[in-house]
UniProtKB/Swiss-Prot annotation:
The keyword Hydrolase applies. CDD domains: Peptidases_S8_PCSK9_ProteinaseK_like. Keywords: Glycoprotein, Hydrolase, Protease, Secreted, Serine protease, Signal, Virulence, Zymogen. Residues 130-406 form the Peptidase S8 domain. It comes from Arthroderma otae (strain ATCC MYA-4605 / CBS 113480) (Microsporum canis). One of its GO terms (biological process) is proteolysis. Residues 36-119 form the Inhibitor I9 domain. This is Subtilisin-like protease 6. Its EC number is 3.4.21.-. The gene is SUB6. Gene3D superfamilies: Peptidase S8/S53 domain. Glycans are attached at N223, N247, N258, N343, N402.
Amino acid sequence: MGFITKALPLALAAFSTVNGAKILEASPGADTIPDSYIVVMKAGVTSETFSAHTDWVGRTYQRRPMRRGANSQPMAGLQHSLSFGGNFMYAGQFDQAMIDDIAKNDDVDFIEPDYKVTLSSITEQKDVPSWGLSRLSTKEPGGTTYFYDESAGEGTTAYIVDTGIDVNNGDFGGRAKWGNNFVDHQDTDCNGHGTHVAGTVGGKNFGVAKKTNLIAVKVLDCNGSGSNSGVIKGMEWVMRDASGGGNSTSKASKSVMNMSLGGPRSEATNRAAKAISDAGIFLAVAAGNDNADSQHDSPASEPSVCTVAASAEDDTKASFSNWGQAVDVFAPGMHITSDKPGNGTAVLSGTSMASPHVCGIGAYLIGLGKKGGPGLCDTIKDMARPVIKNPGQGTTNKLIYNGSGK
């Protein structure tokens, strides 16, 4: 029923230490990737220190006898080095002895298991008119018209971290471009989720910000599967691209990012999300589809992002939507019509569909001259209306509104 990119259940509450950094442990039954870890360095570690550390990891791994993982294949060792505005981390495959040695390093903050990220089932319903655009631009439910300023997010850039985008879809009018791919060698959306999300953010027919530029950042494959470390790698690329390689903040302040994905709470993911917000990029994320407290999910639990729950047509919380104090705002998430690859349409439900409404409003407001970055979420909350019935324990009752006056 619900539709969101999500990881299978995983808890990182427990941890062990080896005379140094915390080694976070997955709960029993968690869908971790065997022998795969994300290592996060302490705040204040310099690029020189990080480089020396990863060089040490590489040399130490090479000196040891070849290790084979659970699938009998040789372990890869260090795979990705990641940098977020002075925050460093890396991912790789290591045996327990190597992880224990890494944890003893004074510059390491914590280590957590890498885990699988997948899509839940897709909900499709034919011939249902979309209602989300009308709802976010009118004060009462039941409308059929979308009211918006003709600026429509012009001059902004929306990064869609997902399954990719069908950039040739006619609804995007040439405004969709391919950014990067961190999961496979197919630079296309062979799943459909990312194209649907992009259509809600900035499609000509279904989009909130109809003139924003859309950038595809693929972190999930055709089956909707990927890894947490791959998602973080995609996040790093967005931050670098939006900040012009670190030399400019002007593009970042006019950039928005959508993550209709998530999983169990991950300190590495939350730290990466905070770095993106700190760089001046507005980040909208899905609250989750488990009808549970979103404080247990990432990146939804990161305070600096704009966490979005899903509402139904009658202004109630969608039955599947997560709730809790981490939720910033509600947006339409039931039976949302948008694009699919090949110029068709699909009707999907989930907080995956709610989040791009907020990402689109972010681009729309920046186009109107509002200040971008994480403070934009406060602007959106201030404009939202307290109309959601039964939002959930400790949860805001505010539904997004674009300020049309209608």
